[in-house]
């Protein structure tokens, strides 16, 4: 599908928000991703918009150092007026609202998947608790802070916890420090949240996702309750 690039803007110092206008309405589930089709490769990106925005797709694209794929995408964004895409893709998505509390754990731009899920559930008046943990390296990487804090301030059931992994983030940072999966588990146990009742979505690299899975299973989460695209894209032997 060929889409017109509606706009490109910076969300922070290095992450771009790309809006694509589709030639016809599209259908997908919150949490799915697409591929940007280039001449010599296909590059996956989670969809940040919701299924309710059926003719406008939002992507968040951040450059990755020493990556040919990333360099190719950045070059296209600097010059192109359209993108060819393939969608919908992925097995980690929200087909129906869960019947209990929801835990979302994201690393870096993995937050795009969680943004789509969160905003979709808002539209559906989801009544159970949503716990969103977002792990980044530095405070300035929390480029959707205002959005999620606004949701938290206007929703009784939404909890947003950003986590910085940089060991000494400086005096301006008063929030959580560490690895996002570990911080999430520690805080949930401290708050006496029953892990076996949670539906969990995790977005990040394979090492982060599987480490989070192992920690939560050790503390009583059924394996079937955790969902991540990494389980199918990079299955563990």
What are the language-model segments listed below?
Residues 87-99:
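A short, basic/flexible loop-to-alpha-helix module at the beginning of a structural domain
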Residues 102-111:
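Short, glycine-rich nucleotide/cofactor-binding loops
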Residues 61, 105-106, 136, 203-204:
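Small/polar loops that bind or transfer phosphate-bearing groups
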Residues 58, 84, 103, 129-133, ...:
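A structural signal for isolated positions on well-ordered beta-strands in alpha/beta enzyme cores
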Residues 137-237:
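Reductase modules of NAD(P)H-dependent flavoproteins
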Residues 111-123:
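Histidine-anchored nucleotide/phosphate-binding helix
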Residues 1-81, 137-138, 164-166:
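Ferredoxin-reductase
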């Amino acid at each position: 599908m060929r889409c017109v690039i509606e706009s490109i803007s910076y969300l922070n110092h290095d992450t771009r928000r790309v809006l694509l206008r589709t030639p016809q309405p599209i259908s997908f589930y919150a949490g799915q991703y697409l591929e940007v089709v280039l001449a010599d490769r296909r590059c996956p990106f989670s969809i940040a918009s919701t299924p309710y925005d059926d003719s406008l797709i939002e992507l968040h694209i951040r450059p990755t150092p020493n990556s040919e794929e990333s360099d190719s995408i950045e070059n296209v964004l600097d010059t192109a007026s359209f993108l060819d895409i393939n969608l919908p893709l992925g097995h980690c998505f929200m087909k129906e609202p869960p019947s209990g509390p929801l835990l979302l754990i994201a690393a870096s731009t993995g937050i795009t998947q969680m943004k789509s899920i969160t905003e979709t559930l808002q539209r559906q008046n989801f009544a159970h608790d949503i716990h969103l943990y977002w792990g980044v390296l530095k405070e300035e990487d929390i480029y959707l802070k205002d959005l999620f804090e606004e949701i938290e301030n206007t929703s009784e059931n939404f909890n947003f916890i950003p986590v910085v992994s940089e060991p000494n983030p400086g005096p301006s940072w008063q929030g959580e420090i560490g690895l996002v999966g570990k911080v999430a588990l520690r805080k949930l146990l401290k708050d006496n949240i029953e892990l076996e009742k949670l539906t969990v979505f995790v977005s990040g690299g394979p090492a982060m996702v599987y480490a989070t899975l192992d920690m939560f299973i050790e503390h009583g989460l059924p394996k079937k309750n955790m969902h991540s695209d990494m389980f199918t894209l990079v299955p563990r032997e």
